[in-house]
Amino acid sequence: KKYKMTGTIFLITDFVGRPGYLTWEQVKEMSDNGMEFGSHTLSHRPLDSFDRNGMRHELVESKKAVEWRLGKPCHFIAFPEGKFTDAVLEETQNAGYRYGFTVDTGRVFPWDDPYNLDRVPFFEGPVSFEHFRFRLTLSAFSALLWKSHKFFDHMEFTKPLAKTIPEP
């Protein structure tokens, strides 16, 4: 608000109001001041771990909660753990979402698949303004760092190399 900046926050709607999470009052105030809110499902459980009915419930009920609390349509979903299948995409579209986001770091272009969009994620914990600015202005470079770090970090013999690549 102070800097007149906007962004999108993805809510795990069953977590709203829990200690360490936003309250619906905070969400509403932020929404009224230009922040956008999307769904990150009810429970944050990967959608591909549910049967179709469970998937549908997570998608529809989370979307309804955001829309009811904010009085605005909810068009965005961030897939928990970035995981999705053809069935997840079908249920996402059926639930009325227009855009789906992964956990991959990167910028979005007009030609991108609207249900497989990269983002510039910020997870829990403090983030300095300098780090925030770096992530936004250098998101393409940041994406390369993130992907390189993840690639090298998952193999035992390259873990030492991963430690030399800064996590964006």
Could you say what each language-model-derived stretch is?
Residues 38-53:
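Substrate-binding clefts and substrate-entry loops adjacent to catalytic sites
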Residues 1, 49-168:
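C-terminal active-site subregion of NodB/CE4 polysaccharide deacetylases
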Residues 9-13, 39-41, 79-81, 119-121:
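A cross-domain feature marking catalytic cores of carbohydrate-active enzymes
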Residues 6-9, 42, 71-74:
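Catalytic domains that recognize anionic headgroups
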Residues 14-17, 43-45, 83-84:
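Short, catalytically relevant binding-site loops at active-site mouths
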Residues 27-41, 58:
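A structural motif
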Residues 1-33:
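Active-site beta->alpha N-cap acidic-glycine motif
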